[in-house]
């Protein structure tokens, strides 16, 4: 069972659903337009083991039930997220192809870029199964701070993953049992 937060167009959630056709994926996003697009993309690509919901982080799951095990608690083996992580003051300086075409909601991570990240990492343990993994995309230079958030929230085996430009771009960790 997987969950993709801040799912945007659904590319990560759809990829997870395709990789595990006998599993199930939930995805959430605050943007109604993003949710609509993710649902359209999922239908177009045949990702029928995916439920896309509108709302803030984990809130859309309040009434969700485990889709594979009747009566089982809704705890995820994997949670992924690509939250807004750009500091508010840096948005004006972004390249125009990002600044002018991406919704501000998808970019603005607050004063230091980590506003939503703090809440996401702190809340994730309540939604993960024991030994579950959290993996989040981060902005350039944010990985050490996010690693500390993971440690404070009780994650172990914390790893920083670099992108093709060798920038630490993803932080992952395993929920300590």
Label every model-predicted segment:
Residues 16, 98, 120-124:
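Class I S-adenosylmethionine-dependent transferase superfamily signal
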Residues 85, 174-177:
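C-terminal beta-strand of the catalytic ATP-binding
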Residues 51-53, 105, 159:
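Structural signal for short hydrophobic segments within the conserved structured cores
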Residues 85-115:
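Mobile active-site "lid"/loop adjacent to the S-adenosyl-L-methionine
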Residues 111-174:
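Conserved Class I SAM-dependent methyltransferase catalytic core
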Residues 1-93:
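Conserved SAM/SAH cofactor-binding pocket of Class I
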